[in-house]
Design a protein with these regions (language model features):
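Small-residue-rich segments of transmembrane alpha-helices in multi-pass membrane proteins
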Residues: 19, 44, 131-146, 198-203
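Hydrophobic alpha-helical transmembrane segments in multi-pass integral membrane proteins
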Residues: 139-160
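Juxtamembrane helix-capping/reentrant segments at transmembrane boundaries
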Residues: 61-81
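Short, hydrophobic transmembrane alpha-helix segments
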Residues: 21-35
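Short, highly charged, low-complexity non-transmembrane loops/tails of multi-pass membrane proteins
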Residues: 186-210
């Protein structure tokens, strides 16, 4: 599993994006827009992964160098991330077929989080504002998220409580995944977070002085 995921996780995500694109082409007229939104985002996410990991790639290495923290079981981490991707995109697409709105909102929230993550990386890495994945986060994922939220709002589908449900649906499993990856590294989660925050703050100060 470790070796397989190290080698092929990118291609699995790419295949997921290709399947999503094929579904959109075949079902654009018949599928409701509510269901199309998370599927569109799957395509956007696959494009984003291409920039982060291959063209030009290097986002994982950048984060590792900024924080000074190395992931020992990278294949396991990639498997967990792939499972989370399916959970946060494919599952909402299926639930949207039953008319459920807040899971779709959870998918769209990823587009906002991705932008914030890359802006945070830019703040820490003073030597270069760009980080691999930033262009597609800003030009692809974020516009898809904004359009999706705009469409949901104009259709009167969003209720205030949906924001809470969407956030919980997305963030609780994400934090659990992070904790599991850290645990597989042989480190308590609070120590990992403290070390990462200190390393990022130190990198930011050093970059600022330069």
């Amino acid at each position: 599993m470790e070796t397989f995921m190290r080698r092929y996780s990118f291609w699995l995500t790419t295949a997921l994006g290709a399947c999503a694109l094929a579904w959109l082409v075949a079902s654009w007229r018949s599928a409701p827009m509510l269901q199309r939104l998370p599927v569109i985002y799957i395509v956007a996410l696959a494009v984003h992964e291409g920039e982060e990991l291959r063209f030009p790639g290097g986002f994982v290495e950048l984060v590792t160098s900024m924080t000074g923290i190395e992931i020992k079981n990278l294949g396991l981490a990639k498997f967990g991330l792939l499972c989370f991707t399916v959970y946060a995109t494919v599952v909402p697409a299926l639930l949207a077929g039953a008319g459920m709105v807040w899971p779709v909102m959870a998918t769209l929230l990823i587009g906002v989080i991705e932008v914030l993550a890359h802006l945070a990386a830019a703040r820490v890495n003073r030597r270069c504002f760009y980080s691999p994945g930033m262009a597609t986060a800003l030009a692809v994922q974020f516009p898809v998220a904004c359009y999706g939220f705009w469409w949901l709002g104009t259709q009167g589908l969003v209720q205030p409580i949906y924001w809470l449900w969407a956030a919980l649906f997305l963030l609780v499993p994400l934090f659990c995944l992070q904790a599991a990856i850290v645990r597989s590294n042989g480190q308590p989660w609070h120590e990992f977070m403290g070390g990462a925050l200190r390393a990022m703050a130190r990198a930011g100060r050093e970059g600022h002085r330069e």
